[in-house]
């Protein structure tokens, strides 16, 4: 995953424009968890769609940015204790293309008021969720079977509308490339890495978790083995589901043309590719200073190139 992450970050850095970048997190209320768990592909896809539409529609409003930004979205479904916690990380450029194909950049911090963002997102998600319900395109597990009843559904929807779906604006980046480096931490993550696992016994698994508040020390979480496996498997995405998606001027269909125009308007590209065209051995050496052709024990050249692989020098 580390190599894939390096390559992904390198590719995205070359797409960074000269503007501030913002990290926005949209989180779904836990009351939706039973419905989410039995409609994963459909409702995760709906989350991607609603986050993107919310950001794009508000950004295009002249009161806020009046332009189409670039957006990278990454879906996560867990928290530090591996509980079901569905949320979307979005990196949003503070600049974009206007309808007359000019560049406009935000001069503020985050350019959309949080309350406006919250209301738009909540309204969109619940309206589209209600459409799926009316079209009978939702599945119901025993834990949410009661929602088949239209009166129960209306009551459920009213409760969701009354909740505060407040998005979180986590970071503002003025160093350009560091926004992508930051998001790179999220793109190739899985629910838990080996480095967090402290011990495994016949009956329990112990692992570290961040403190519940900023500045709190790390804590140890211990779960029965079966519960650890259950929680881990909750975060396996449906086959073929794309957890990383691109919108705005980064949408795949028009990305090359949009970036070419933006770089022309801004006087050049901010960053160049670091690892383009490198073999795996060259990338490992450039990124981590690790030369796989040299024996780590004695320092001698132990391997020689043999096409795309290496052979032992005998």
Residue ranges and their predicted role:
Residues 1-314:
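Beta->alpha loop/short-helix hinge microenvironment recognizer with preference
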């Amino acid at each position: 995953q580390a190599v894939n992450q390096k390559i992904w970050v390198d590719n995205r850095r070359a797409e960074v424009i000269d503007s501030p970048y913002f990290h926005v997190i949209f989180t779904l209320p836990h009351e939706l968890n039973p419905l989410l768990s039995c409609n994963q592909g459909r409702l995760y896809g709906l989350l991607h769609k609603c986050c993107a539409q919310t950001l794009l529609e508000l950004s295009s409003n002249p009161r806020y940015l009046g332009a189409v930004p670039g957006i990278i979205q990454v879906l996560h479904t867990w928290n530090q204790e591996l509980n079901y916690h569905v949320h979307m990380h979005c990196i949003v450029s503070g600049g974009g293309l206007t309808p007359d194909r000019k560049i406009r950049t935000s001069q503020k911090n985050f350019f959309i008021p949080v309350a406006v963002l919250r209301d738009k997102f909540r309204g969109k998600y619940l309206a589209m969720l209600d459409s799926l319900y009316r079209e009978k395109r939702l599945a119901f597990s025993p834990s949410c079977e009661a929602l088949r009843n239209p009166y129960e559904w209306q009551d459920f929807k009213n409760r969701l509308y009354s909740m505060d779906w407040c998005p979180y604006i986590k970071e503002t980046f003025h160093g350009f490339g560091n926004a992508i480096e930051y998001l790179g931490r999220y793109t190739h993550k899985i629910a838990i890495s080996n480095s967090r696992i402290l011990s495994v016994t016949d009956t329990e698994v112990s692992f570290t978790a961040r403190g519940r508040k900023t500045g709190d020390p790390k804590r140890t979480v211990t779960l029965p083995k079966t519960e650890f496996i259950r929680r881990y498997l909750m975060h396996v995405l449906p086959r073929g589901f794309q957890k990383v998606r691109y919108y705005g001027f980064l949408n795949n269909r028009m990305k090359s043309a949009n970036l070419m125009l933006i770089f022309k308007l801004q006087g050049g590209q901010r960053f160049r590719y670091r690892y383009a065209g490198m073999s795996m051995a060259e990338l490992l050496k450039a990124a981590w200073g690790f030369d796989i052709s040299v024996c780590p024990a004695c320092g001698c050249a132990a391997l020689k190139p043999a096409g795309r692989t290496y052979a032992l020098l005998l």
